[in-house]
Regions:
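A feature for the membrane-embedded catalytic helix bundles of lipid/isoprenoid biosynthetic enzymes
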Residues: 1-73, 77, 91, 113, ...
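Residue-level signature of catalytic and energy-coupling elements of molecular machines
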Residues: 83, 123, 144, 204
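Short hydrophobic alpha-helical segments within the ABC transporter permease transmembrane module
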Residues: 134, 142-146
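Short active-site segment of divalent metal-dependent hydrolases/proteases
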Residues: 86, 126, 147-151
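Membrane-interface helix/loop boundary segments of multi-pass membrane proteins
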Residues: 127-135
């Protein structure tokens, strides 16, 4: 029960902070009233899904080193949850900054860039903090992996819709994200358990995509040549990581299958 209360308090705090932030933007930019209504409904729906998922799987909140059950949401997991719950706000900020450029102008792009940069930056802290403090939980690993691909997948689609990224780059990123989800699904079915693991190249690919999306959101004129260069470098690294993920799948299947199937 203490864990459920901790989850509820954490999500309620994030909900209020994000709602207040959007309300400030809503009033400052004089947006249509239906935007606030839609954002509120989307937030409530999204948060309800997260809450029920966490409560239903509360038994996964255990320390992977000691096996001890968690009685509250630790700091690393709170950081991960913050990253996940930022999704609706990021999507709405992207929509507003592109759909109402005459109202948001330069300010909207700056806010959007800062929001993306701060959200993606949390990915560098939660896992590291969990390892240093020896607070790694099984649920934390699942959330960390899911947050990256959920955020990047939906944000990439939003960026493509508003022509913030090129079609070829969109395809490269989506193929990489889809392949990772497919690999996790296959290994989970074969191994009868979710193993949210990643490779070094996988981590690099995710970091590169995050940095690239921040640059694409900023679209600073003086940096445009460098952004084009970054797009090419990102596509190359993502392509290499796709091959790496296929190799990872092959190894995972080989270790999961009986010895008779290895030959």
């Amino acid at each position: 029960m203490d864990l459920v209360k901790s989850v509820a308090k954490t999500l309620l705090l994030y909900f209020l902070l994000q709602y207040i932030a959007f309300f400030i933007f809503f009033r400052f930019w004089l947006l249509p009233n239906n935007y606030l209504v839609i954002f509120t409904l989307v937030q409530l729906f999204f948060y309800c899904i997260i809450f029920f998922f966490l409560v239903k799987n509360k038994n996964l909140f255990y320390n992977t080193l000691s096996g001890e059950k968690e009685t509250k949401v630790n700091i690393p997991n709170k950081i991960t949850l913050l990253r996940i719950t930022m999704l609706p706000l990021l999507v709405f900020l992207t929509f507003v900054s592109q759909k109402h450029m005459e109202k948001t102008s330069h300010t909207g792009r700056v806010i959007l860039t800062i929001a993306f940069a701060m959200t993606f930056a949390t990915d560098a802290f939660d896992g590291r903090m969990a390892r240093i403090k020896k607070q790694e939980t099984y649920m934390g690993k699942i959330l960390d992996s899911a947050s990256d691909y959920l955020l990047l997948g939906i944000i990439t689609i939003a960026f493509f819709y508003f022509k913030l990224i090129k079609p070829w780059l969109f395809l490269v990123i989506i193929i990489r994200l889809f392949l990772n989800a497919l690999v996790m699904l296959i290994l989970s079915l074969v191994q009868k358990k979710i193993h949210p693991q990643t490779t070094v190249l996988g981590k690099i690919a995710i970091a590169v995509i995050m940095v690239l999306l921040v640059l694409e959101a900023a679209k600073i004129p003086v940096l445009l040549p460098w952004i084009r260069l970054a797009e090419g470098a990102a596509a190359f690294l993502i392509g290499i990581s796709i091959i790496d993920k296929i190799v990872y799948l092959k190894r995972g299947l080989k270790s999961a299958l009986p010895m008779d199937f290895h030959n």
